Amino acid sequence: MTDSPEIPYLLRAAKGEILPRPPVWMMRQAGRYMQIYRELRDKYPSFRERSENADLAIEISLQPWRAFQPDGVIMFSDILTPLAGIGIPFDIIESKGPIIDSPIRTQAQVDQLNPLDPDQSLPFIKTILKTLRQEVGNKSTVLGFVGAPWTLAAYAVEGKGSKSYSVIKGMAFSEPSVLHQFLDKLADMIATYVRYQIDCGAQVVQMFDSWAGQLTPQDYDVFALPYQQKVVRLVKETHPDTPLILYISGSAGVLERMGKSGVDIISVDWTVDLAEARQRLGKAMMVQGNIDPGVLFGSQSFIRERIIDTIRKAGNQGHILNLGHGVLVGTPEDNVRFFFETAKQFSYQD
């Protein structure tokens, strides 16, 4: 039953099929906790090269697949990748994160942005996704991903990651029309990019609105939700059958609002009890998550307990097992292996 030759397991779950166990993958399952990744990073120190050189990105995406056989293989990339294609150059500095030398602060800058032409500015994405589909066949589901409008705007306006988001909040609360026009353009760009990823082979796409949890619920309703909805609406017009996931870090205060975005699956962070999340979202909404990444530093017996507890709280359908955030640097690889083995041995019948 778990080896349907036509449709991979995670995709079956994402389309609502009732299965013997939840599918499992991890956010940031390719990355710095893996020694094989660190060796490749030492050889190719530029993050943009690792994520935009198709051969390197394919190799990195497949490292956790070869090691652990997760039910989902997500392409190795970054949420900022499409920005250069609309006229916002950026770099990603190891240990510092993204840097945008000319942050978007004025109406004139917003007016100068151009529409995204992925074939022209992101041709490596096609190679990455097509190759991943060929490599994993129907043994795993290939996931694409994008940033959501508010989060991409936060990076582009701040010029880097931020703890306070004072620059973009200053724009939101003093020049909202400039920010709304920017968010609208970003929503168009992201929808184009999601469609492109699906056309290139992505079977499920996750949208990260990582910084929307920094908004009050009333500001979320104005600056985040309408633009998430626009992305989803545009994608569903052309690709109605591709499941879409929404993830927000620190989402406890806006969980019900996430459910109004139009996505098929809500990825829940670890600060919310999953049984409570299902109650708040309604049984019809599928969920993903939501184990604390710190659990993977614990004993294997504790990891097993937490996996079983999380699956039981989620109920026996409409759940994809994942962490509530990305895998942390320094996580023991053996514990990641144990996590996947334990999750895949689980049965709702037991």
Swiss-Prot record:
Pathway: Porphyrin-containing compound metabolism; protoporphyrin-IX biosynthesis; coproporphyrinogen-III from 5-aminolevulinate: step 4/4. Its EC number is 4.1.1.37. The keyword Acetylation does not apply. Keywords: Cytoplasm, Decarboxylase, Lyase, Porphyrin biosynthesis. One of its GO terms (molecular function) is uroporphyrinogen decarboxylase activity. Substrate binds at R28, Q29, A30, G31, R32, D78, Y155, S210, H325. InterPro entries: UROD/MetE-like_sf, Uroporphyrinogen_deCO2ase_HemE, Uroporphyrinogen_deCOase. The record marks D78 as: Transition state stabilizer. Its main location: cytoplasm. Pfam families: URO-D. It is found in: Cytoplasm. The keyword Lyase applies. It catalyses: uroporphyrinogen III + 4 H(+) = coproporphyrinogen III + 4 CO2. Homodimer. This is Uroporphyrinogen decarboxylase. It comes from Microcystis aeruginosa (strain NIES-843 / IAM M-2473). The lineage of its organism: Bacteria, Bacillati, Cyanobacteriota, Cyanophyceae, Oscillatoriophycideae.
